[in-house]
Amino acid sequence: MLNSAMSVVILAAGKGTRMYSDIPKVLHTLAGKPMVQHVIDAATKLGAAQVHLVYGHGGELLKQTLKDDKLNWVLQAEQLGTGHAMQQAAPFFSDDEDILMLYGDVPLISVETLQRLRDAKPQGGIGLLTVKLDDPSGYGRITRENGKVTGIVEHKDATDEQRQIQEINTGILIANGADLKRWLSKMTNNNAQGEYYITDIIALAYQEGREIAAVHPARISETDGVNNRLQLSRLERIYQAEQAEKLLLSGVMLRDPARFDLRGTLHCGMDVEIDANVIIEGYVTLGHRVKIGAGCIIKNSVIGDDCEISPYSVVEDAHLEAACTIGPFARLRPGAELLAGAHVGNFVEMKKARLGKGSKAGHLTYLGDAEIGDNVNIGAGTITCNYDGANKFKTVIGDDVFVGSDTQLVAPVTVGKGATIAAGTTVTRNVADNELVLSRVPQVHKQGWQRPVKKK
């Protein structure tokens, strides 16, 4: 039976000794963001009125990393078990709300599973998430009588008979705030570990005649925890496989789903094709018929219809209109903007630069702090010299300009419409419309020149 209000407690106090890291375990990343952030996001989507985060090791780093989230920070100075952690948060529980208990190192838990758990919670009872494992070694076993859940026995405290039980506790549960506070106050640490187990509340609830409803997740991997980097890497692959499956079923062509990483949010149009070893980070939008070549990295960018990004290009915080072509081996840095039909070729770098409609920068070029008009040709080896060691300056190039190879444009400088800049020119002054600009060192010819030779 569903109460109108619900808050969430996320346990995140563990150090994560087996990670062999100075970083708190829950801050290690999965799919580009901290594990605990996945759990916070799930709690938020579920509509939690408040999220209590129980922390201990690395508290300052946790607070700094999660500063944008609305959290109630609860200190667990000593790690004396899950029950002890919940006792620290208990003073913040309202009597008339449900409390959902989650873990910062169980990052794949889904909103759908949590909603089913919330819906299944009996009035005055407990909703408990359990799974059945072929090898339940090390996990707390679910004990039942006549099919009803009666308690949870930790592996270290279980009898040989109880250790044969395959149904195990995931640690995720939901109960009423008033009931939970009462049960937490009755817990003891009379067990092999000398800790306060949250699992003891199951037996306490059963003794009061309360119903415990067990719910299974859609996928066992939803409840997998992380204690070491091997487990984290396995969950990463599970997560990525799930994301790839969703994209394929929605019409996106992933040439090799096992070699695709989504570390953010991807929105795709129709007939999008993505080759192997592509990484998507942040918020990315791909229009209709976009093609992404092998080995590309796309981050926080919008790619318009019919664009093609050739292999091993990096696109970050950029905006491409329709029918642009990029790469191979191109780099678009933050602030790069390409208008319709523009082309950026191999070993071209753009930053805070706008390339107009139909304009081309085909090879070996740096365009920084630049505004480039339509139908402009940027020759190979062109550089906008935008930095004097202290300040950045802008280069403006008008429509229909032809820039020859090996040109340096020393900003601030403006090149007028229709101008032609000869190869090898260093432009230091503004150029008027339709002018030809060239700078040359006199070419010297020496007949009969004897090339120096090495002495033996």
UniProtKB/Swiss-Prot annotation:
Binds 1 Mg(2+) ion per subunit. It comes from the Bacteria. Its cofactor is Mg(2+). Keywords: Acyltransferase, Cell shape, Cell wall biogenesis/degradation, Cytoplasm, Magnesium, Metal-binding, Multifunctional enzyme, Nucleotidyltransferase, Peptidoglycan synthesis, Repeat, Transferase. One of its GO terms (cellular component) is cytoplasm. This is Bifunctional protein GlmU. Residues 230-250 are annotated as: Linker. It is found in: Cytoplasm. Mg(2+) binds at D105, N227. The active site is at H363 (proton acceptor). One of its GO terms (molecular function) is magnesium ion binding. Homotrimer. The keyword Transmembrane does not apply. In the N-terminal section; belongs to the N-acetylglucosamine-1-phosphate uridyltransferase family. In the C-terminal section; belongs to the transferase hexapeptide repeat family. It comes from Salmonella choleraesuis (strain SC-B67). GO terms for biological process: cell morphogenesis; cell wall organization; lipid A biosynthetic process; peptidoglycan biosynthetic process; regulation of cell shape; UDP-N-acetylglucosamine biosynthetic process.
